[in-house]
C-alpha cells in the first residue's frame, strides 16, 4: 500500500521530456548555427587561416600582430571616438526630443510620427541619401551653409569632418530612442509633479528630482544598447567611404576605418581569417566588460520605483 502511494506521488518525467522534445529544434539550431561557429572562431583566432589552406596553429601571434598594426590601433580610436561622443549626445538629443513631444500641442501624433520615421528607413538607403547630402559640390547641406554665409566643408574628403558626418547620420535615427523615452515619461505619476510644485520646485528642479530619476532605468537600457551598437558600427562608414569598383577604403587618412570595417577587410579582403577571428573575440570581450562596468556603476545612479 505504501509503495503504491509513493508511486502515485513520484513526479512524472514525461512533461520534462516533452518540453525538451518541443524545444530540440531550437537547441539544435543554436548549437549548429551559433554555439558551434563561436567556438570554432575561438580556435581560428589562434591559427593562421586563409580559407584555402588548413589552419596552422600560431598561438597568440594574431593578437600580438594586431597590437602592432597601425590600422588596428587607428580603427580602435575611430570607433571609440564615435562611441564616446555619439552615444551620450545621442541620448541627450533623444531625451530633449521626447520632452518636446510630451507637451500637449495640436498635431502631436503627427510630430511623433515624423520624429520616428527616420528610424525605420533602411540604413543602406539612409547612408546613400546622406552621402548625396554631404557632397561637397552639389550636396544640399553645403548649399544651405553657403546661403547663410557659413563655411562649406568637404565632409567626405576632409579627415576633420568625416567623423562629424557619421555622427549626424547616427543622430538622424534617434527617433526610436526618443519614442522609448516618451513612453517612460508617460509613466511618471502626475502627483509627483503636483507635490513638487506645492513645495516650490521650479522647472529644472522638477526635472532633476522627479523626471530624471524615473527615466534612469530606461537610460541604462539605452546606454548599454547604444554602446554595443556604436562599437559594432559598420554600414554607415562602409557606404560613405565606398568608391566605385574599389569597395570601401576607410575614408581619407583612414579617418572612418572603424573596428568592424577593419575586421571585415582582414576576413574578406585580405583573407586573414585568424586575425579577423582574434579581432572578433577582442570586440566580444570589450563589449562584455563595458556592459558589466555599466551595470555595476548603475547602482549609483539608476533609481527604480520600488526604491
Can you describe what each PLM-predicted range is?
Residues 15-307:
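A structural signal for multi-pass alpha-helical bundles of membrane permease subunits
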Residues 1-14:
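Short, Lys/Arg-rich, polar N-terminal cytosolic tail immediately upstream
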